[in-house]
Swiss-Prot record:
Family: Belongs to the FAM89 family.
Region (Disordered): 141-175
Polar residues bias spans: 157-169
Gene, per the UniProt record: Fam89a
Protein name: Protein FAM89A
Regions that span the bilayer: none
Amino acid sequence: MSGTGSAGMARGLRVDGLPPLPKSLSGLLHSAAGGAAGGWRHLERLYAQKSRIQDELNRGGAGGGGARAAGMRTKPPNLDAALALLRKEMVGLRQLDMSLLCQLYSLYESIQEYKGACQAASSLDCTYALENGFFDDEEDFQEQGSLQDGQHHGSPRDQSPLTHLSSSDWILESI
C-alpha cells in the first residue's frame, strides 16, 4: 500500500494552477512515504521551505537568510552555475546593446552626411537618388511627376533642370 500512498501524496501536493513536481523533487516525495503522519509533516515542511525560497527568489533574494542558506546547501552547484550563466548572458546582452547603439549612431551620422552632400551637390545622380529614395509616399512622387508633365511638353533635356529644382525645393521644405 506504500505505492498507492505515495501516489496519493503526489496528487495531494499538486496545487491547481501549478505544474507537477519536477523529477528531482519526486524522489523526495517517494522517500518521505515511510510513516503516514511523519511523512506528511516532513512533506509539509519541505513544501513550506520550498515556498519560502521561491518567494525570496521572486522578491530578489532579500531577507530570510536561514531558509535561503538551507536551500543553498541542498543544491549549491546548480544554483551557482545558473547564476553565473545568467550573469554572463547579461554581460553579453549589455555588450550587444552598446554595440548596436554605436552602429545606430554611426548610421545616423552617415545619413546626415549623405543628406548634406546631396543637398550641396547639383548633379543629376544625386537628384535621381533623392527622387527614388526620400519620398515618404508614392503619391507625392506621382503628383510631382504629373505636375511637371502637365507644365512642360518639351524634350527630356528641357525637363531635367526643372526636376532638379523641384526636388531641391521639396528637400528644403521637408527640412
